[in-house]
From Swiss-Prot:
Subunit relationships: Interacts at the cell wall with secreted rep1 repellent peptides.
The protein, known as: Late effector protein 1
Subcellular location: Secreted; Secreted, Cell wall
Signal peptide start and end residues: 1-24
Length: 86
C-alpha cells in the first residue's frame, strides 16, 4: 500500500513539474521590422530572372546527372557472405 502512495506522489510531482516548467517558459518575442536589413530581402532582379526563365536550374542539374554513374557505390565486404576459395 505504501508503494502505491509513493508512486502516486511521484506521478503527481512529475506532472506538476512539467506543468510549471511549461507555464514558466519565456514567451518568444518576434524581432521588430527594424532588425530586417535591405540586404536580407530578395533582390528584384533575381525575382525577374526566376520568373522569366525558370528552366535553367533544372537544365544545369540534368546536365550533371548520369543515371549509370556507379562511382559512389562500393561493394560491401562482408566476411559472412564471402566464401573461402583457398
Amino acid at each position: 500500500m505504501r508503494s502505491h502512495q509513493m508512486a502516486a506522489f511521484f506521478a503527481v510531482s512529475l506532472m506538476m513539474m512539467v506543468v510549471l516548467g511549461a507555464l514558466s517558459a519565456p514567451i518568444p518575442s518576434p524581432r521588430p521590422i527594424e532588425d530586417i536589413y535591405p540586404s536580407q530581402l530578395p533582390d528584384a532582379g533575381t525575382a525577374q530572372i526566376v520568373a522569366g526563365d525558370s528552366g535553367i536550374l533544372p537544365t544545369l542539374l540534368a546536365v550533371g546527372f548520369d543515371p549509370n554513374d556507379r562511382s559512389v557505390l562500393k561493394p560491401v565486404k562482408n566476411s559472412m557472405t564471402q566464401r573461402n576459395t583457398a
